[in-house]
Amino acid sequence: MKTIQFVKTNDCLACEVVENIIFDIIYEGNLPTYIDVQKDTCNDAQARISMFHTITVPLLIFRVDDKEVARITGSMPADFYKTVIDKFIEL
């Protein structure tokens, strides 16, 4: 089972962009049924540090069989996020 965990805050423009990319992938039907997407909103920086070991958002954590295989954090170009998500789906 593959999992994409998306962590965001309420006041983050980059988080909205990544959320829209994920929504578009799901809406277009490009997300296989064996990939789970989890979305968490975590506005408390201390909680993000204790749970995810970073305060930076947006944060995408990619897991295969509950083992973390990749992590993207911070503001990146939208195409970068889309490309990485698409490649994870293809694997």
Where does each model-flagged region fall?
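Short alpha-helical
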Residues: 13, 44, 79
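Non-catalytic, surface beta->alpha helical segment in thiol-disulfide oxidoreductase systems
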Residues: 56-91
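Local sequence-structure signature of Cys/Sec-based thiol-disulfide redox active-site neighborhoods
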Residues: 1-28
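Short beta->alpha junction loops/turns
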Residues: 11, 38, 74-77
